[in-house]
């Protein structure tokens, strides 16, 4: 037993144990060189993680990005998302991160979850409402477990009309008006009957044009509208009405004439509608006591202005001097049936009204039914005779667009009956914007009594509205 104790004792001797302890302590001490290397290694770590997508930062970007929101709204179409109630409109779906990928099929932009939102046709209305409520709940709860959309949806002011901020409403309105003026006579023609249904009168348009003029003066410090793309009053009236109803454009030279709604993402090609009557306003407005017939207003055309879709079919008109257009008349309206057939049997050439038709011209000059025509650059024999309707600035919006729906008020369930009654009188979005603009114009008029230019412009606006009304009545009663 003693031998075994002696064999073990050298391992635990005091001479050996302190050396081991000293080595262990030295291993735990970091020298200056090693510490600098460690600091360099820790500094490199954030650079290596730069490519890593933080879910929290990604969620804050998605839920606060207005462009991403309207990108999801644009994915909804009438073919893939039809027959849905207002509670399931694309604005509400995009609010919670959903995009429309197939018919009645939604996909989350973050967690890639899918949601089938089909509504089966049922005769029981209570079951239909129950299904709608289930889909409303699914918009929030159908995401994956750690998806951020249920807790941080997009704010409502992304698409709401900020009627409580007059300065924002006015600046947006003037911006849309300025953009639309670039289309000039390519702007669509608006039916006078639609303006009557909207309760838009000549006086209303005059006030809005006055407000636009004052706003441009305050921004640029100019006394005229030289910064606008067009100085035509008829163009200004049409652009004013379209801007009031929420339409704008990103038109550039050489591009197609398309107007769009920034709220419902609706895009409309203006070549499918009747464009503005090509009337030379300087001549038509110079004689206020001279009545203008609808047919004459339809035939007028300003020199040097032609819409792009007419340049293709009427490119040959540039070969002829405008002076030759004075003698051009529509003889089919004034001739007998036999003479009319004889004229139609001959080919229509550029020399009509001259040469062999000189006798016909003399007869027309002596006819008491002859009406004086203004010079036209467009040939009456053009094949561009496809029927085009007028543009309705309200019905062209999508049914769920905020511009054509009642503005949503805040919850008033705990408030008094008077406030609830006032909230129930909320009007359509475009009407709320109109009230804000008129109130702003009224306040400026009271503060600035110098309104000498208003009667002149108002008189011209009244005349253009009368021309539109006469043209509408003539088309209804040919």
From Swiss-Prot:
Keywords: Cell cycle, Cell division, Metal-binding, Mitosis, Nucleus, Ubl conjugation pathway, Zinc, Zinc-finger
Organism lineage: Eukaryota, Metazoa, Chordata, Craniata, Vertebrata
Biased composition (Low complexity): 377-388
Region of interest (Disordered), residue spans: 285-389
Role, per record: Required for proper positioning of a substantial amount of TPR at the nuclear basket (NB) through interaction with TPR.
One Pfam family matching this protein: zf-C3HC
Bias (Polar residues): 351-363
Gene name for this UniProt entry: zc3hc1
Primary localization: nucleus
Superkingdom classification of source: Eukaryota
One function term, GO molecular function aspect: zinc ion binding
PTM characteristics: Phosphorylated. May also be weakly phosphorylated on Tyr residues.
The protein's name: Zinc finger C3HC-type protein 1-like
Cellular compartments annotated: Nucleus; Nucleus envelope
ZnF (C3HC-type) intervals: 93-147
Cellular component GO terms, alphabetical: nuclear envelope
GO biological process: one example: cell division
